[in-house]
Swiss-Prot record:
Its cofactor is pyridoxal 5'-phosphate. The modification N6-(pyridoxal phosphate)lysine is found at residue 242. Signal peptide: none annotated. Disulfide bonds: none annotated. Belongs to the class-II pyridoxal-phosphate-dependent aminotransferase family. BioF subfamily. The gene is bioF. Keywords: Biotin biosynthesis, Pyridoxal phosphate, Transferase. Homodimer. Pathway: Cofactor biosynthesis; biotin biosynthesis. Pyridoxal 5'-phosphate binds at residues 112-113, 183, 211, 239. The lineage of its organism: Bacteria, Pseudomonadati, Pseudomonadota, Betaproteobacteria, Burkholderiales. Substrate binds at residues 21, 137, 358. GO terms for biological process: biotin biosynthetic process. This is 8-amino-7-oxononanoate synthase. It comes from Burkholderia cenocepacia (strain HI2424). NCBIfam families: bioF (TIGR00858).
């Protein structure tokens, strides 16, 4: 059998299971209201939590950065591609989100995936043990595999199980690794307990705050600031393409850790640096995030979250108890979840269906992703469509059961 035959059979299997992903094409800027596939929709799919992706100040800064530095960086960070915009942004990030450390330093990456690969592969290796939450992001998992460290997975957010694993470990280097806000459930890791366990067992704690940076904590400084946590043994990863509205990611840690990443992190060394204009736009984003406008956007987002929590309980499906901008609604089967997504699409609402392997089998769900750009009218429209779709689904299941019993 040829490779193409193998791939075609694999795609057919995905179709049979309702698991093939399809890209939609956006014709306008990321916003609450967009033109997607040539139709106007209200989008509940993006991670643009503060609604900054189309913010005029960020757009202007991006254009200004391109005029000043050009369209591309021209090389890797170690071979001519590290611009003043990159260096300034790293200093700003360390000052903004590095309050957990006495000597913080930041390192900018092109993507969150690359930042997590760097942290895992450069800080752990043969002889080290990584203790990983069962629901950690795929980029962390891939980094662990590449690191060649021993990986022990503990049940999601189960600090008692983690403590038992740490007690039994004789590894010289120990890393506890966890998302902060889990991207498919919206819950928040028990960070205070994780920090305490790390300090008690001489371990380092690496956290991925992709969905918390910009949203959680005073001025949006992130999950560690929200919990008022400090420790010299923390490595903090954040992304800049979600709440910050631009692109890229960063690692903040003690200056020695960052210097080691510069020297040894392959996903930092062996790739072209992101365009300086991107870093210039992120600097503008940080000003908005930290200012009064950022506070107002976070307050509006918090109100939207509470309203959404209430409206999801009015459906016949199972909402997940989340207090973040990620609001999942578990339906169960792939086919039923796809049918619900299509029903919402018919109302001009884009709410993505999340299916295995992203989530466990039998827990396919709609993932409502909120943005400060949404209005309460948008939520009212969403509620009406969800109730209609869930009632129709329940009626369909009831009819099928009656037919089977006949």
């Amino acid at each position: 059998m040829s490779l193409l035959d193998t791939l075609q059979r694999g795609l057919a299997d995905l179709d049979a299971q309702g698991l093939r992903r399809v890209r939609r094409i956006a014709d306008t800027a990321c916003d609450a209201r967009m033109i997607v596939n040539r139709r106007e929709i209200v989008g509940f799919a993006s991670n643009d939590y503060l609604g900054l992706a189309a913010h005029p100040a960020l757009v202007a800064a991006f254009a200004e950065g391109a005029q000043r530095y050009g369209a591309g960086s021209g090389g890797s960070h170690l071979l001519g591609g590290h611009s003043r915009a990159h260096a300034r942004l790293e200093d700003e990030l360390a000052g903004f989100a590095g309050g957990f450390s006495d000597a913080p330093r930041a390192l900018y990456f092109s993507t969150g995936y690359m930042a997590n690969l760097a942290a895992m592969t450069a800080l752990a290796g043969k002889g080290a043990t990584i203790f990983s939450d069962a629901l950690n992001h795929a980029s962390l998992i891939d980094g662990m595999r590449l690191s060649r460290a021993n990986v022990q997975v503990y049940p999601h957010a189960d600090t008692a199980a983690l403590a038992a694993l740490l007690d039994a470990s004789e590894a010289e280097t120990k890393l506890i690794v966890s998302d902060t806000v889990f991207s498919m459930d919206g819950d928040i890791a028990p960070l205070a307990e994780l920090v305490a366990l790390a300090e008690r067992h001489g371990a380092w704690l690496v956290i991925d705050d992709a969905h918390g940076f910009g949203v959680l904590g005073p001025q949006g400084r992130g999950a560690l600031a929200a919990a008022a946590l400090r420790s010299p043994h923390l490595v903090y990863v954040g992304t800049l393409g979600k709440a910050a509205g631009v692109a890229g990611a960063f690692v903040i840690a003690h200056e020695t850790v960052i210097e080691w990443l510069i020297q040894r992190a392959r996903s930092y060394i062996f790739t072209t640096a992101a365009p300086p204009a991107v870093a210039h736009a992120v600097s503008a984003s940080l000003k908005v995030i930290a200012g009064d406008e950022g506070d107002a956007r976070r307050a509006h987002l918090a109100a939207l979250i509470e309203r959404t929590r209430a409206l999801l309980r009015n459906t016949r499906w199972q909402p997940v108890d989340s207090h973040t901008a990620v609001q999942p609604l578990v339906i169960g089967s792939n086919d039923a979840t796809l049918a619900a997504m299509r029903a919402l699409d018919a109302h001009g609402l884009w709410v993505p269906a999340i299916r295995p392997p992203t989530v466990p089998a039998g827990t396919s769900r709609l993932r409502v992703s909120l943005s400060a750009a949404h209005s309460f009218d948008d939520l009212a429209r969403l509620e009406a469509a969800l109730i209609e779709a869930s009632e129709a689904a329940a009626a369909s299941v009831g009819a099928a059961r009656q037919e089977a019993a006949a």
